[in-house]
Swiss-Prot record:
Its main location: cytoplasm. GO terms for molecular function: retinal binding; retinol binding. InterPro entries: Calycin (IPR012674), Fatty_acid-bd (IPR000463), ILBP (IPR031259), Lipocln_cytosolic_FA-bd_dom (IPR000566). It comes from Pongo abelii (Sumatran orangutan). Keywords: Cytoplasm, Retinol-binding, Transport, Vitamin A. This is Retinol-binding protein 5. Forms a beta-barrel structure that accommodates hydrophobic ligands in its interior. It holds the Pfam family Lipocalin.
Amino acid sequence: MPPNLTGYYRFVSQKNMEDYLQALNISLAVRKIALLLKPDKEIDHQGNHMMVRTLSTFRNYTVQFDVGVEFEEDLRSVDGRKCQTIVTWEEEQLVCVQKGEVPNRGWRHWLEGEMLYLELTARDAVCEQVFRKVR
């Protein structure tokens, strides 16, 4: 049975964010701002339905989905694109595949104790973020 990811998580660290943003063709000005951010994550996990909120001083983003059901994700507030998205469980990792203009785009979340890990991919770039559960 997959873990319940419900909780509020504070940013701890990240690696390779600039490479990831470049792979998405994000402008230099927005990349500079994004690299300064320390976003929090809020996850509400109720059965197969999930809401993931990314919260920062620059921009917030919320995505809601049912695990295993493909949907159109509006990423215009993130990078100006839309894509077809499906989120599934692979063992104890929540895995997202985003099909659209950018190849090999997606993410995966998993827990290790009180730490939430996020791996973001786009093209050949991989960004790793770590968050600590605070409630």
